[in-house]
Regions:
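Flexible, low-hydrophobicity surface segments
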Residues: 1-162, 184, 271
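Glycine-rich and small/hydrophobic secondary-structure elements
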Residues: 83-124, 253-305, 361-384
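Alpha-helical support elements that line or immediately flank enzyme active sites
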Residues: 39-70, 116-135, 204-272, 329-339, ...
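Glycine-rich loop/linker segments at domain edges
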Residues: 8, 13-20, 89-97, 161-204, ...
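Short helix/loop capping segments that flank catalytic or ligand/cofactor-binding pockets
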Residues: 28-29, 48-50, 76-77, 125-128, ...
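Acidic, glycine-rich active-site loops and adjacent beta-strand->loop/helix elements
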Residues: 72, 220-223, 247-251, 280-290, ...
Length: 384
């Protein structure tokens, strides 16, 4: 290949189709006999399910099935697969949190799915959901702040709400460098929790293909990761599961995980031997999509008389939500980004992940790099 061709800009072939309303999203790919699913979700952030009766809803017009945690347990898919969460640098296991596909007892955040209602139409499913008799006992205290270590425990039986922690670098060397510095600059940071607002809300279609394989069609940006996790969840060889990601109407990180709804529609399709489709509405997305950021802490930068960096210490606390996942450790993966493009002889950090009664957090737009870059650049601004 000659140099001229190598440096020529590549044409964009997808744009005309997308801007001409010819995109093919998950909702455009439904088979004619697809069933529609909706979820009864917890209206409280912390408490217990006191009573649940689905008898009246089960006999409603158009209803095919109403699935609960008991059904999931019966089929051996009660909990999400928990892999690759943050580690502790003292060698101890992280505080493991089992995330149920459908909740049967303890509510840990607003919007946890309790029942899956499946019907011939979405309207029929929504009408049936109104007939479900459910009562909750809400707790008066809710763990919303990572600052309150002695607050109500998200996971009773634990010593505190620390999910995991990790230390990087050699702190004594940084302490010595800061003690000798001509100037030290401290920056207390608080990076707010955010959520996404994509054009296409999350949607998922579970089905059985012509070869008898389980199939998930979903608006996801990481189909290969989802493929492996589904295989573990259903205890199947990877060649018995397919994940198809058609055109995705926005994500920026939020659609990078295997969500409970993805697993649930595949399980329902397997159980009913019929395609099952679910799509969130805007309000549902707000409480069921993974959140991001939610990092606070302190950073200290040492400088010599000439303004050269001598040492950097970063202590960061991350709100991980009620459950850990493989994507929780975004801040850990890229905490090295605090070094930036600058020469700093010694750097150390302490990262602590806290449980709260909120939706779990995951990385948006950079997997921890934006937070790390913000910290060092604001420190330099203050030093200047």
């Amino acid at each position: 290949m000659n140099g001229e061709k190598l440096l020529s800009p590549a044409g964009r072939c997808a744009d005309p189709r997308l801007v001409a309303r010819a995109a093919r999203h998950t909702a455009d790919l439904l088979p004619g006999d697809a069933l529609h699913a909706v979820f009864l979700r917890s209206p409280i952030a912390r408490g217990r399910i006191r009573h649940l009766s689905i008898d009246a809803a089960r006999s409603a017009a158009g209803v095919t099935a109403i699935l609960t945690a008991d059904d999931a347990a019966q089929d051996g898919v009660e909990y999400m697969v928990w892999t690759g969460a943050p580690v502790r640098d003292d060698g101890a296991a992280s505080s493991e949190s089992q995330r149920p596909l459908l909740n049967r007892a303890v509510i840990r955040h607003l919007g946890e799915p309790v029942c899956m209602i499946i019907a011939k139409t979405q309207k029929a499913a929504l009408d049936a959901m109104e007939l479900i008799d459910v009562a909750y006992d809400a707790d008066d205290e809710i763990a919303l702040s990572i600052d309150d270590l002695q607050g109500p425990l998200v996971w009773p039986g634990s010593a505190d709400n620390i999910a995991a922690f990790h230390r990087l670098g050699y702190k004594p060397a940084v302490d010595a460098a800061l003690a000798k510095a001509a100037q030290t600059v401290r920056f207390d940071f608080d990076i707010s929790k955010v959520t996404a607002c994509t054009i296409e809300m999350r949607s998922a279609l579970g089905s059985i293909d012509a070869n008898g394989k389980l199939c998930l069609t979903t608006s996801a940006q990481s189909p290969f990761a989802l493929h492996g996790e589904l295989a573990k969840l259903f205890d199947l060889p990877t060649d018995q599961i397919r994940v198809i990601a058609p055109d995705v109407g926005g994500s920026f990180g939020m659609k990078g995980a295997l969500y409970r709804e993805d697993a649930l529609v595949v399980w329902a399709a397997k159980r009913l031997q019929q395609a099952v489709f679910w799509s969130a509405d805007r309000s549902e997305s707000f409480i069921s999509d993974e959140h991001a950021r939610a990092v606070c802490g302190t950073a200290v930068l040492g400088l010599d008389a000439d303004g050269l960096f001598t040492g950097l210490w970063v202590e960061a606390n991350t709100d991980t939500g009620a459950y850990l996942s493989r994507r929780t450790k975004g801040m850990l993966n890229n905490i090295g980004g605090v070094a930036g493009q600058y020469k700093t002889p010694v750097i150390a950090s302490a990262l602590t992940f806290f449980y709260t009664n909120t939706m779990q957090t995951s990385p948006y737009r950079g997997f921890g790099r934006p937070e790390a870059t913000y910290i060092i650049e604001r420190l330099i601004d203050k030093a200047a």
